[in-house]
């Protein structure tokens, strides 16, 4: 019986001893893939924000632009002193952008510095929101399958 209790206690403590760190693997999350925008939402919601103010024709026209290489981001980088840093490039529909980025896995702080591009996009709704979102990004969430900026 004593051996059984010892084995049970050992089995219960193994997960505690091998618990994962709470810090994100930022390089795994951001790099090695092309990120495609699926929607732009208000924080805490998972549906597309109504940039079109109920203008269904404008909405449909914008949604048709979410194809191919439109609304994409590619991050390259490395981990330096526990902070991921690198370069990025992105594209809305007609406007392209590139620059530097850094992210902290402890507090999920994100800094994006646009060096080139980031101007007016052909789609005045989603394209504008995509570019404005990059300019004002300060935090990220997600994992290596979903990225929220």
For every predicted segment, state its role:
Residues 1-2, 21:
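N-terminal hydrophobic targeting signals that begin at the initiator methionine
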Residues 2-10:
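Sec-dependent signal peptide recognition
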Residues 11-12, 138:
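Intrinsic disorder/low-complexity segments
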Residues 15-19:
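C-terminal motif of bacterial Sec signal peptides marking the signal peptidase cleavage site
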Residues 20-149:
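Lipid interaction determinants
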